[in-house]
Amino acid sequence: WFGCDDFDDDLVDAIKAWQKKSGIKADGLCGPGTHRRIFTERQSKIDDYEPDLIKDKDESFIVHHGNFIPINWPKVVLWSEVKGYKARKGYTSYYEPRDIKMFVNHWDVCLNSRSCHRVLEKRGLAVHFLIDNDGTIYQLLDTNHAAYHAGSKKHNHSSIGVEISNAYYPKYQDWYKKNDFGERPIISGETVHGAPMKDFTGFYDVQLEALKALWSAVHEG
């Protein structure tokens, strides 16, 4: 796309150069944002969704720098397991431990982790972890590899990417209730850079607890 293989700074610069050359002054959503919203809208109207119903485990592990690290969370599925999701593209492999400086936690704007994984595959992107509506943590690849999720090469190569399932818009509340996840909290009165935001759906408590367990496991590992 625009002569670039990855969705990173080089692609953004290429798009800006094309816009300038073409005399385009109004910017628009650059691919993934538009794709996610259209995909989520379509998925909400399909009636064949069935949750994966992941069972609790007595012991759970994630893979961090090539090692199995225990995590204090009952619902964890690795890419090598049945019902697991694997990143097939959208990352750079490393054989020496990466210097990881941060987590980048994404609001996936999808109805569930299965849909998020499909969008990532479609866009040639990847993250290390998905957190589903019921708090299930899916690991897509070893944290030792750099996933393409944060836009810039600098941030991709120094971070762990997590997509947390939440379709964001209150109009999807009926979908969550229909599929037995329950209503999401509605967040009101927030501002970003001084600009007021419209109401949006918050995360389930179980998702936030799963995220904290993941942070803790990586920190201790």
Place the predicted regions along the sequence by residue.
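Cell-envelope/ECM-targeting effectors and their regulatory/trafficking segments
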Residues: W1-V82
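Active-site-adjacent loop/helix surface patches within enzyme catalytic domains
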Residues: P70-E220
